[in-house]
Amino acid sequence: MKKGLLREMLAEFLGTFVLIVFGVGVVAQVVLSKHTAGDFLSINIAWGLAVTMGCYVAAGVTGAHLNPAVTLALAVHRKLPWGKVLPYAVSQLAGAFVASAIVFLTYHDAINAFDGGVRQVLGAQGTAGIWATYPQPFLSTFPGGFIDQVVGTALLVGVIFGITDSRNSPAPAGLAPVVVGLLVLLIGATFGFNSGYAINPARDFGPRLFTFVAGWSGEVFRAGHAWWWVPIVAPCIGGVIGGWAYDACVGHRFPSAG
């Protein structure tokens, strides 16, 4: 493996780790405190700040994708070498998995106090939702939940393309991570109700895989009408659509130089 690619993979690993350790951490605090130490607003704010901090960690090396859907969209629309897509995605997944383990270790005693040591996925003592997303009971896996994830990720990637386009009105130098964090906060505050706005395959599957091996059993893949695949597939499609929409409406409409 080339040293340059290894450096990029490590940056994506650490950036995603920072994103997930803070993001999952805030959900753990809210759930385990039974909403006495936070609420849905604090979750949205913390996830937005988590994105910002993760981006600052990795931006100078890779641009801080921290999300396989973003990586895929950049390969499709921005000439990111296809050979980097899988290594980046694996690194992002690994960062999310390790971050999930750290949150589990930190809150282990609180989890046991909450559920009595009996790991449950859903229900009053369910704790798997601290790590991965699960849909509301009324939400269909397809098309409802699928559309939810496509729309959320399309908004994410489309706006990211806008705020990083030098021909447009990009975020001021060094402030792009702040703007992206605000964007994620906004998505959570407007489209978080249906299923928790995963909008990132690594953010959902890495923590879900951790809960599978840490005692929550295969129910983490069966719950929510086998919801697990939706936050993997739909964001990848949504990201490509969002990038296409930006380019079709704005990106390809700028006059050619000269």
Residue locations for each model-derived region?
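Membrane-interface helix-loop junctions and terminal tails of multi-pass membrane proteins
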Residues: 1-258
